[in-house]
Structure formats: C-alpha cells, structure tokens
Amino acid sequence: MGRQKTKVPEEPQDRLDTSLDPYPDTNYLAPCNKETVMVTLYGATNLPTCKDSSEPWPYVVVKTTSEEANNHSPQARTSVTSEPTRAPIWGDTVNVEIQAEDTGREDVTLKVMDSNKKEELVSYEIPIKYLRAFHPYHFELKKNEKEDEATAKTRLYATVVRKGSLLPRYIGYDHTALEVFLRGVNEPLVNNPSPMVVIARVVPSYTEFKARKARQDPASVGLPLTQVSFPISSPMTFDVPRVSQNGCPQLSKPGGPPEQPLWNQSFLFLGRDGATSFSEDTALVLEYYPSASMKSSEPWTLNQPLGVSVLPLKSHLYRKMLTGKGLKGLQVERLPIFDTNLKTINGEAPSVNLAFQLLSSERPENFLTPNNSKTLPTLNPKILDENLGAIRESWSVSSLDSSQEAEELQPRDVEMNNYRRAMQKMAEDILALRKQANILEEENRMLRSHLTQQSIEEEQNRAEEENLAVSMKQRLLLNELDMKRLRDRVQHLQNELIRKNDREKELLLLYQAQQPQAAQLRRYQDKLQKMKGLEDTVRHQEKVIEKMEQILEERLHERKEPAPSNRPQGKPIMDAFAPQASGIPLGPAGENLAMDLYSMLLAENTRLRTELEKNRQQSAPIILQQQALPVDPGELGAGGDLAERLQDTNGPGHSKYTETMPAQDFLGGTSDKFSLLAKLEQAQSRILSLENQLEESARHWAREKQNLAIRLQEQQHGFGQSPNSIIVDQPHFARSQGSTTPRQNLKDEGYPGNIERPLQTHLTPGTRDIRHHLR
C-alpha cells in the first residue's frame, strides 16, 4: 500500500522512509459519486538520459487527461531520488480522484520527469475504464520498440488500484470482503539484515498452491507482474479471471527496523475472489521477502522467501467470528513463520501478530486499525495448533534434509555468517554515510542556489516596491483630484436638484393658481358671447325703433294729403285720439307743446344714435359671432306687415325717414295733433327710460369688454396674475339650463327684466294703436 500523499508541494521532496510511518492509510473507499485511482510507484530501470546526456533526477507525476488538457498544476507526484540515477526507487503512493460519470473517458497518465531540467523522460497512459474495481494490478510498463526506440528498454514498476465508493456485492455471497491487518514480528530477530516486505494472498486450495509453488510456477512465486506495452493494443491485457487459484497477491510496504519488522498494514480481499468462502483447504498465505532485493537491477525478482506463514480459514473460524460482539473478527497473537532461517533472541522461529474481520456492508464504516484490532477476540492457541498441525508437518519434512546439511556445515557457516554480517554492516554504514554526504551536498547546493535566487528576488522586489510606491502616490494624487472633482460635481448637482425642486414647487403652485383662472377665463368667454348676443338684441330693437319711426313719419306724411271723398262728413278723422283719451286740452298752446316735444324727441333720438355708434366703435377688439335674437312678429303688429318692413332696414342710423320735418306738416287737424301728442309724450317717456338703460348698459358692457381684452392680451403676452391676486368687479353670468333663446339668456344673466320689457311695453302698444288708427 505504501505511504499515501494527498497534498504535494510545488517542488518534489526527497523520498522518505515509508517503514517509519506508524499510521497507515486504511481508507479503501472513494468519496461518494467519485472514484479514486491509487498508484504505488516502486521504481524504474533503464530510464533515458536528459537531452544533454546527463543522468536525470527522476520523479513521477500522476494526473488525468482532463487535468492535462486544462493545464492544471499536478498535485499527485512522488519524491525525487537522492542522487541522479537511471534506476530510481521511490515506494511512494499517490491518489487521483475523478467523478464517477467521467471514468469512461478518463485516462491516468504516469510521467517520469527530470527535477532539474523539467524534462519529460517517459510517459504512459492507462485507461481507467479497463481496470477492474478493487483489483490490485502489478504492472511492468514499457514502450513498444517500433514506437520509441529511446525508451524501448525502460521499465516502470507500479501497482494500480481503482477504488469505488461501494464494495461490490455478488449473488451467493453473504459478505463483501475479508480484511487482514498485519501488525509485525513478535520477538526481535538476530539474523535479519534488512527490512522485509510481505506478499499476502488468500488461496482457495492451499494444497494445490503448494504443489504449484514446488513446481516453480511463475504465478505462484513472488509477485507476478502484468506486462503492458504502450500503446495498448487490446483491452484484454487488463482482463482478470473470475476466480484465481493463486489468489490476488498484495504487496506491503517495507517493514522495519530489521531487528523487529513492524508493518501495521491492512490487506483487503474481496468475496468475489473466494476470500469469504471458508472451507477446509482455504488459507491465508503470507510470504516474507527482504527489501534489499528491490535494489538490484531487476527489483521485482522476489524468488526465494525468508519464510512463510499460513492461516487455515476453516468453517469453525467462520462460526467463531460470527459469535463475537461488535466487529466480526478475530486476532491471532502468535502465527508462526515456517521454512525460515530467521531466529529470535531466544533461538526460536519467529512469529507474527495479525487480526482479520468479515465485512458485510457495501460501505463499511469501521476498518481495522492498531487500536481497535486489539479489542477483537483472540484465537485459542490450541485451535491454532490443530489447524497448523498438518501444515507444520509438511514444512518440517521438506526442511529435514536441509537441517542435516546445516548441522554438518554449522561451525564454518557460523564464522562465515558472522564475517558476512560484519562486512554487510560495514558496507551498509559506508553506503549510508555516502548517501548522507550526497544529501548534505545536495542540500548545500540547493541552499546556495536558493540564497542567490533570494538575493536577486530581494533586489527585484526592492525595485518593484519603489516603482509601486511611486505609482501608488501618483494614483493617490489622481484619486484625490478625482474625488475633489466628484465632490464639486455632487455639490453642483445637489444645488441644481434643489433649484429644480423649488422650480417644480413654483410651477405646481402656478398650475394650481391658474386652474381657477382658466375656469374664470372660460366664464369670461361665455360672458362675452352672451354680451354679444345682448348687443345684437339691442341693435335689433334699434332697428325696430327706426322702423317704427319710419312708419310713424310715413303715416304722418300721409296725413298731409286730403282725406278721401268717400269719408263721412262731419266725422273727425282721429276719433281714437279723443281729448278724453289723451288727457291734453286742445288749443294753440297744446300744438306748440306737441311740436316742441316732438322736436326734442328727434334731437334726443339723434344723440342716442350717435352715442350708441360711439360705444360700438369702442367695443372690445375680440368680437365673437352670436346669432341674433328673433323678433316676435306679434309684438310688431297684427298681420306681420311691420316685421316685413323691418327686414328692409339697413341698420341703426340709416332710416330714410329720420329727417326733421316741420311740425305743421305732421299735424293736419286739431284732434289728430292732440292724440298724436299724447301718444308721442307717452312714447317719449318710455324711449327716454329705455335710452337711459341702454346707455348705462352700453357703458358697463364697454368697460367689461375693455377689461377682458386687456387681460386676454396680458395672458397672451405672459403677464399672468400672481397666484395671490384677487379678481374683483367681475359679474357672474349663470349658464342657461335647457333654453337656447337669447331672451331667456338675458333673464338668466341676472339683468333686470325691464331692459327687455320697455322694448315691448313702451313700443309695442303705441305702435299697435298708431297702426290701428292709421288704418
């Protein structure tokens, strides 16, 4: 299994002694939804030299194809050898995690790199999808001679295990795996020169395995390697048989110290390999090899073991494991090592201490450790002796001949062994000192290079700091200027915002103040239209008056003519105008008074026309068209002849009969004069009152028109009234509801009804009487 490295620094570190690690990694499962590829790099042979023909300082980088495509910094790498060599030995274990759904398209790339020149010496790509989960592959990787002649002789030795998040479960098996925890040798050894490695396997038939081992079957001797040539020609290279008669051998890390090796390492054997099928011939086989053989030119030629330990896995052991509480396991305190020359300080054969348990879950939570393995029930030594009886006899018979020969050569061999041991120890000390000297020289060289590089970096950093300080000062000054400019800008925007808000408030107040003014303006316009209609009504009444005057003058002019001959004799012509009706006495004085009144009436009439014309010329500049008020034909006389005559009128002041005529021409007789004078006096009084009202109304209307015109011009030129101004002296005109005649509009405006009534009561009755009299 070896030492696991989960986080590697930027520069590879020197190789550490894995035998000194007291806490090995016992995590056999990958995280959920992921898979882990564990790669143990043992060593390499015949590595190519660098481009400058110098020997490399090799180390191995392990990454996936996706990491290599994305140029990610490699996190899984081994240590660097202590000296330049073409046959390095590492013994490091690295892990690479990938997503479970990406295993079908991911490859694991092993690159041997040179530490000094960062050159790639050789690389191999192993498809993950071809690897069987939880099966230990012991690879001998090489290149095809046709592909690359420079690396054709290079060999890389590694163990690759693909781990999933769950242990596989197969039909017919109650348990998923058997875990074996090997602690170490119980007593110190006296003749062990180097650390030891252990090859552990579970064989379904120990008898057949021993026979194959005696025949020197390559699959049962040492650690069988799977040779893989790149590029890979067929996926059958990674094929694994369903059940192997030789088991699935697993290699431990080197156990030290040599006097009493200690491993504290677990081995996991799956149920699909028959490890959980306890039978009479199933056995756990542990083979011990010296780790010194790994330093030769062919490091994996583990042919002759130092000893063998065998634990029969019979059915009563299975039942014994199930009866325990907690973990389903047992511990064996003294499992002997057979067929060995190793001796303890007591002169006895050594023994090892181990523990094992059955795993039933696909994702177990508790694996064996140095602490919890001591809590397992201990296997009874008597039962162990019974199980090992036949095995001990078989090993003793085979070793009897060798023991007799050893007794003959024992005195001389002891001396030779002592001499060899002393020479070997001296050689090991010399090699250790040389290795330590090389390490110190390398450290000194690295320290000198680091010191030189650090001094150069300090000078560069000092210059960069000075430049950075200058640039920071400039940036600070620019930032201060920008801050000041932005502060002024913010102040300006705040002032502008305040002015905008004040202006908005003013406009809002002005809008609120103009709302009643707009309504008032609309009322003024309605008032102008109504005033225009009233003026049209007045003009129409003037036309009526003029027409009546013309008719009156015409009738008076006709009276100057002699009476018709068919008129009855002795009857006055003006019976209707009797003195009793007029109330004025007859005589010369009455005639003069009537003439004076009529003259005054004509003069006043002329003056009123002039005044009306003047007021008309001084009216408002804005003239709104208004439909003239209709004239009731009944008011102008029966038969409508007066209305027909009024249609021929050209307007006020344009009557054809407005000339002043002598009084004697109009009064032909005494009775007629008095009657007409009475009527004229009555009409005179009525006309005077009407003219006074018309004059007052015309003046009032002229003033209102002028004020409205001035205000309209002010509104058009922008001289609007302030919101606090108060409009006074503006009469209110009520709107007409449900009536459209001008006469009803005059009544609805609030004017006194006698403005229209005199035009009817003062003019219409007299006009009717005159027309009736003239007829």
Swiss-Prot record:
Residues 12-141 form the C2 domain. Residues 414-561, 672-715 form a coiled coil. The keyword Protein biosynthesis does not apply. One of its GO terms (cellular component) is peroxisome. Residues 7-18 have a biased composition (Basic and acidic residues). Gene3D superfamilies: C2 domain. Pfam families: C2 (PF00168). Residues 71-84 have a biased composition (Polar residues). Keywords: Coiled coil. Residues 1-23, 68-87, 735-775 are annotated as: Disordered. The keyword Disulfide bond does not apply. This is Coiled-coil domain-containing protein 33. It comes from Rattus norvegicus (Rat).
